[in-house]
Every structure is written in structure tokens, then in C-alpha cells.
């Protein structure tokens, strides 16, 4: 039995030891492939409804509905990052007692939150769609999709919480295996429900929730079978106020940051909705296409958060600082490669989603206008992830909410109202990123732990 435990431990990346760039890549690639399959998982819905149902269904799944899901679920995912940071620090410090308390407190908190998030999403879906000025022909399918999605919120939140716990201890492989399985299952169910049984948006929503249920069950089973200190044991699931406080201290700012991001995106969606169904469909599809860039950037951000968290817990400040520099270089190399590919193949990529040439033309213009500025965000993503791993979350949240979210909203009402059009809307992204990136760099060099050493 002891031998099995040791074998299990060797499967977990030793983040506090070894060559930094190699250890970062060992941890990064499973997250990258995981986010890739997550993107394929999400994109399958859009491709199927776009090609086999119509542009109204495409707008329903990929437009305002996507924004609402990101707003409500994104807040909880931010809270999950709090659990991830706390557990990674305890794991790095080999504090077994507090790690167990944080893990089991996080799980019961997840159960309680799923009830609140699911209920709120179900009730508020239609009013928010109207508030966002969603085109009338899109609203019925959007409401149907959101009601089914939020009815299955429990599975989505459980998967996100357990996956964040596994990554916190350096296990980025098993969440990847789960995503591969559920991604293939989602594509199969999309084809069966939509192409064969002609269930439209209803079929896409049912396929999504079914796969979320499978993913939640699988990752929970992995955590229950773990032969290490992070094993989930149902009889130990209870609230520990100190652990909950530590999780919320880090998770709440991250959750609020996510909410502010999505409020800004919701506001942008309102302005986009005023430009008609073709632009709404193109913008929603753009969100699926540029997610290829975000999955790379976010994979590096998740990697550096866990990397900094464990080394911070172990007191290895020099290694922690060096890892940020290494991660930044790798993230920029990847960002330039992905951005170039998206710009070069913009037209054929859009044709994968829809045969409507008007939508394709609008979408290709969006990619070529906006994608070149995405590299600016890399600074924000990596530094924010590093600061979060060290437990520094309040000021980064303020910088993000003010520099990105608030400034973007001000731009929309101050500039876009007098200069209407999709180009004016998209310009809010690089303007807000440049200002926020400068603020993050200044804060990092002044306040990151160990910079004075």
C-alpha cells in the first residue's frame, strides 16, 4: 500500500524542484490541451447550430447567452481560484492538517453555491436578455438554452472546483483526461440531438448539461481515489470558518474581477446587439474563435498561479520570481504564433461556423482589426496570475476593474455613442489593456513578494 502511495506522488509534478522552464511546461501542457478540448467542447455547439439550424440559433447560443453564462458562472470560477491558491500554498508548505480543512470546506461551499448560482441564473435569464437589447427573434432560443444550462449548474461548478483542487497540487493531467472524454461525448450528442433528431437549441443544451454531469462525476471520483493528503472523504466535508475565510479572501476579489469583466462584456454586447443579427452572430462566433488565444494565455496564467503558490508556501522566493520571467517569455512566444495563425486563416476559420457570407465578412474584419492587440493582455494575465498565487489579490482586482472594466464602459458611452460602429466598440479593448498593463507592471515591481531580496 505504501508503495502505491509513493507511485501516485511521483505522478504529481514537483513544482518546487527542478529546472523551472521544464517544470512549467510539464504543468502547462496538460492545462493547454485541457483548455483546447474545453474550447472544442464549446465550439462544437456553435458549429452544429450554425450549420444545421440557422444564424438565429447561432446568435442564441453564442451571443448574449454566452455573456450571461460567463457572468454568473465566472464569479464562481473566481472563487475556485481562491481554493486553488490556498490549497497550493498549504501543499507547498506540507501543512497537511490545514490542507484537508481547506479542501473539504471548499467542497461544501461548492454545493451551497451551486444552488444559489443555478437559481439566480434560471430566474434572471430572460430579464437580462431583454435588458441587453437582444434581438427579438433570438430571445426564445436564448431563454430555452439558458434555462437548461442553469438547471445543470451543479455539475458545472463541481467540475470547476475539483479541477482547481487537482491543479493546485500539481495534477493537471487527470482534468485533461476528463475533458477529452467529455469533449468527444459532447460532439457525439450534438450530432445525435441536432443533426439526427432535429432538436435545435434544445438538443445542444441537453448535450452540454449531460457532458457536464459526466465530467463532475469523473473528477470527483479521481479526488476520492487519490492516495495522498488531498483525498476527498465525504465524512470530513464540513465548514471550517478559518479555511472558508482564507478561500474567500483570495477568491472573492477574483470572483468580483470576473464579474466586472463580464459586466463590461455584457455592456459591449448591448452595443453590438444594436447593430443587427448578422453582427451579433459574427461577434458571438468571434468569441469562439479568439478563445484559442485566451486558452493559451489562461493556461500560462493558471500555471504561474499554482507555481508561485507552491513556491511561496515553501518559502522559495527567488525561484518564484524567476518563474514569472520564464513564464512571461513563453507566453509571449505562444501569443505571437497563435495571433498570426488566426489572422492568416481568418476566412476559412469563419466558414467552419457558418455559410452566411455577410456574417463571414463581418467576422473576418473583426479578427484582423482586434487580434493584433491581444498580445498586450499577456502582461496583465501573467502578472495577475503570479500575484494571485502569492495571495496578493485586492490591488490587482482594483487595477483590473478600474483599468479594464470601468474604462471600457466609459469608452462605450463616451466615444461609441458619438462614433457608432463595430470598429469603435472593438477599439475599447486595446485602449483599456495598454493602461492596465502599465499599472500592473508598476505594482509588480513594487509589491511582489521577495522583489526586495
State where each predicted segment sits.
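Small-residue-rich hydrophobic transmembrane alpha-helices
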Residues: 58-119, 156-175, 282-346, 377-400
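Transmembrane helical elements of multi-pass membrane transporters/channels
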Residues: 26-45, 148, 159, 182, ...
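Transmembrane alpha-helix boundary and packing residues in multipass membrane permease domains
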Residues: 31, 35, 47, 85, ...
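Short runs within selected transmembrane alpha-helices of multi-pass transporters and secretion channels
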Residues: 80, 148-167, 175-183, 204-219, ...
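Short alpha-helical transmembrane segments in multi-pass integral membrane proteins
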Residues: 1-28, 87-152, 196-252, 308-373, ...
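Small-residue hotspots at the loop-to-helix junctions and early N-terminal turns
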Residues: 53-67, 142, 146, 205, ...
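Helix-terminus/linker motif at the lipid-water interface of multi-pass membrane proteins
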Residues: 36, 40-59, 129-136, 192-199, ...
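Residue-level signal for short hydrophobic patches within transmembrane helices
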Residues: 17, 21-40, 44, 68-75, ...
